[in-house]
């Protein structure tokens, strides 16, 4: 299994805990679900994950502590989450990141500009 789209389902942190055995997963869509920061801890084993969509979830800056370990990520959707400038610092080492969606967050131009210094090849949609 390489692609798993669980968008707009009732999946919770408990439900995604079983995903850590899916090591070949490259695309995971958890947008519009009940997933929180605590649930993201189990995703760190998904070393091949390239696309992760967390739009409209309860994810905060704290959740990016786990996301920063997904070094293969190329796409990260954080639309309409509680991310701030402080959280962006946590993902500044995701050197493979090509696209970051931040629309509807509290991130400012200052945060975006600081992140672009670390990830110049990343398109940031805000």
Regions found by a protein language model. Give the residues of each.
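Concave beta-strand-loop units of leucine-rich repeat
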Residues: 1-126
